[in-house]
Amino acid sequence: MITRTLVLLATVATVAGAQSAPSATSQIRTNWKDMMANVTAAAEEVPDAIYAYKPTPEVRSFGAIMAHVAGSQRMFCAMALGDAPTAEDDIEKSATTKAAIVAALKASNDYCERAYAQSDAANAAMVDVFGTQRSRLFALMMNATHDAEHYGNVVTYMRLNRMVPPSSRPRP
């Protein structure tokens, strides 16, 4: 009887302590949301005059980087949703003011929310990513990685203009 009770208690404790692992998509979504919170905060906070700033003539301006992020997000998330992707540089060519760029960035975030809300099963489906069959999850990982790459540019541009980037500020 004692053995049965101990086995039962051990089983209950194991089941009670077990937690299901978060899905791959939800983990990538968390990473993407954190990154885009910083990118969007920077886009909103940087003054209009700095949107034209380029540290050297051959690189994108701050505004062009933000527009590029908005456009590329739209492209990657379209791939992940199975929609026809737009050209990566559509927004970069059409949005030229801070207001238009911030609006495009927020719209691309909203669009991407749908892609990151898909299940792991849905994100296992294969789609065309630059001419190669990859999973929808791969397209979402590419998006999050690409956003992080350009947030590095944003941090540098802000520092060169004596601004503190969102990710370097004390947390509340």
What are these regions (language model features)?
Residues 42, 93-128, 134-146, 150:
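Acidic/histidine-rich alpha-helical segments that form the ligand environment
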Residues 21-28:
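Disorder-to-helix initiation segments
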Residues 29-33, 37-40, 48-90, 128-172:
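Short, contiguous alpha-helical
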Residues 16-20:
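Boundary at the C-terminal end of the N-terminal hydrophobic targeting segment
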Residues 5-14:
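Sec-dependent N-terminal signal peptides
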